[in-house]
Amino acid sequence: MSAESAAIVQPIALIPATKTARQARIAALLTAQSVRSQAELAALLADDGVQVTQATLSRDLVELGAVRVRADGGLVYAVPQAGVDRTPHAAVSKEYLDARMTRLCAELLVTAEASANLVVLRTPPGAANFLAMAIDHSVLPDILGTIAGDDTVLVIARDPFGGAAIAERFLQFAEEPGT
């Protein structure tokens, strides 16, 4: 092989034909770029040598917890960051966490209602797990935890009567300017 042809040859990353490898590649693609449709995602996977049917891709997206969120002037797929350490590190400021929660609430929060120490947050279908995970990762001190369904997040306040204040905070996050 000549020096010229050796310079042209690019190494090719091989992706195993396993469900785990396919889902890892899907998560990586959704994290790296805005993907607006399953057809676009299937084309990106095909470019990587991963052939997938629409039904399999749909199941993979559900299993990954992918949801469609508003970004770049339209809806794009997003995957929650699973396995992330929930303890904030020094590099992550309160301002960053508040800005992230503001953005997510502006994109996902439909309503917030409280009763005693409980807050019920409504989201578009399929987005509740994404919002609940973001709340859990933000480590808000007055929140004990969350439980998510398809379009509903139950937030449990530490204070027996703190639900109203937390509901109000989420509504403020959703209404802040610049979102």
Swiss-Prot record:
Its main location: cytoplasm. Keywords: Amino-acid biosynthesis, Arginine biosynthesis, Cytoplasm, DNA-binding, Repressor, Transcription, Transcription regulation. Pathway: Amino-acid biosynthesis; L-arginine biosynthesis [regulation]. It comes from the Bacteria. The keyword Chaperone does not apply. GO terms for biological process: L-arginine biosynthetic process; protein complex oligomerization; regulation of arginine biosynthetic process. GO terms for cellular component: cytoplasm. It holds the Pfam family Arg_repressor_C. Disulfide bonds: none annotated. GO terms for molecular function: arginine binding; DNA binding; DNA-binding transcription factor activity. It is found in: Cytoplasm. Regulates arginine biosynthesis genes. Belongs to the ArgR family. This is Arginine repressor. The gene is argR.
